[in-house]
Amino acid sequence: MATSSSSLPDPYGKPNECILQLDGPDARHFLQGQTTADFQKAPVGATVYTAFCNPKGRVLADALAIIISDDTVLLRGRKPVMEALSAHLTPFLAFSKSALRATQWTVVGSGPSSGLQTEPVSAQLIEENDAVTAVVINRGKGFIEYWQGDASVIQPDPEDVVPLARVDFETARARVESSTIGAYLPQDLNYDLNETVNFTKGCYTGQEIVARLHYRGTPKRRLYRAIIANISETPTPGDGITNAEGQRVGSIVNTLPTGEQLGVLIEVTPDSTHGPLLTREQGQALSSLEACHPVTDQSMG
């Protein structure tokens, strides 16, 4: 790992990622009522995966949060998604003793490294002059995610840098894109299976819908990883996926270009995975289908 007194230069910083900073004595309380995660019980330095939903339980934004202190929380997400989220939260912040602002922090992934723990751990906070200037996050499977402020003192080796999209793909972490804001229930993205949703924390926007599906319903779709070989046209997140009969059974969630192949995270009905799947718009076949998490609910029936 190399070190520097300057911030990460291009091509390290990825403008598609944005970090918001929530400050104030009500920061945790505000997030407790707006997101699917339990911010009240999480300790300082914890990594908290969470989602913001609308009243219908649809996901407006996903975020990886780091609790910097009792009064400060950083939230990382796709830049256009976080911009829309900031506008959505503005009316609610008027009644909270907290303020939300965009930062100039950069985000980059690195790995995989066989020397790292396979399971994620709490974030490492890097400080200068009593201020947090960088965050190092073990994403699991040998991948690291770095967040860096203007005056940071740490950066990864350039040879180890990988797109954050690869980190998300390899660790099966579905992301909300600008074209899929409000499109999915948390269960469609397996957020109920990877600790993004806490079902005991109490009320939050959309909680009634999300909890009802968890306790009384059957998730219709689940998250899978797949490959599209010899791509002629790259599908867009939100594009449909069909079975051999042309029936829509799900959609593209995220994409990862890898040369002539395209890695994709998709949400589809579990029953449809027993037969051929095609991209609806391009008619391209999906292969190497793999469930992102073990699914034990009744949706497998």
Q: Model segments located where?
A:
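Basic, glycine/lysine-rich polyanion-binding surfaces/domains
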Residues: M1-G301
